[in-house]
Amino acid sequence: MAQHDQLHRYLFEQFAVRGELVTVSETWKQILENHNYPQPVKRVLGELLVATSLLTATLKFAGDITVQLQGDGPMNMAVINGNNQQQMRGVARVQGEVPEGADLKTLVGNGFLVITITPDEGERYQGVVGLEGDTLAECLEDYFLRSEQLPTRLFIRTGEVEGQLAAGGMLLQVLPAQNAQGNDFEHLATLTETIKTEELFTLPANEVLWRLYHEEEVTLYDPQDVEFKCTCSRERCAGALRTLPDEEIDSIMAEDGEIDMNCDYCGSHYVFNAMDIAEIRNNASPADPQVH
């Protein structure tokens, strides 16, 4: 098995085209933990994970990207959030029976692809495109064409290696403010499209690039680790409780004696008792530990 859960950037200087290659296994597995998703939903989350990793690698600033599918199908929501440090988390919501072998359109139904870019400093940007493509890669290419106006191709694969979940993908994109020739970009895209799933999952990045582009000059940069990391915390939950009306909190406390909050992403469980609520109302941060 190749070195998994790593992202590699590479560059074709003579063509003004950049590329990325990512493979993930453990990160995908951790996203699926604590959830009993049908197989097609697991696959889509793997594809979203790959896509989000590739997209966050295009950021030139500290921040995060959220890639979300929304629709009226049996999987009415699936989302992956990742930052420029390649820290990922994700979740899906299933509201109906998922047919075995369901494709993207069957899962999501009539829906949208929503991409939200949130810099640590600066304005948040959100782009929305209809799910007109048959695959997630096609929908993302449509997004780039409409919003960024940068020729972009994505190649996303999911499967198993030695009994372990594996997902991977590649991205090609014309560098901003560069005038790459269309024929050159299509030539590189045609080469990239020949990647075999087994090669992507099992070969080191430098060997994958050599097999695809051995007649081209390619600069491969140092890899970046991809990992699962949830940003939930007791403090964030307390902040959410501060936004609720006192009457609503009092009603829950009167009925249950405490407030339970669960993180959909990682399964962490937070409990707030009457003393905690009093501290929250006094703008103090409750110090009780989280309960897993």
UniProtKB/Swiss-Prot annotation:
Compartments (UniProt record): Cytoplasm
Modification note: Under oxidizing conditions two disulfide bonds are formed involving the reactive cysteines. Under reducing conditions zinc is bound to the reactive cysteines and the protein is inactive.
Single biological process term from Gene Ontology: protein refolding
A GO MF term: unfolded protein binding
Chief location bin: cytoplasm
Bridged cysteine pairs (disulfide): 230-232, 263-266
Top-level lineage group: Bacteria
GO cellular component: a single term: cytoplasm
Matches recorded under Pfam families: HSP33
Keywords annotated in UniProt: Chaperone, Cytoplasm, Disulfide bond, Redox-active center, Zinc
Function: Redox regulated molecular chaperone. Protects both thermally unfolding and oxidatively damaged proteins from irreversible aggregation. Plays an important role in the bacterial defense system toward oxidative stress.
Similarity annotation: Belongs to the HSP33 family.
Annotated protein name in UniProt: 33 kDa chaperonin
Annotated organism of origin: Enterobacter sp. (strain 638)
Gene name as annotated: hslO
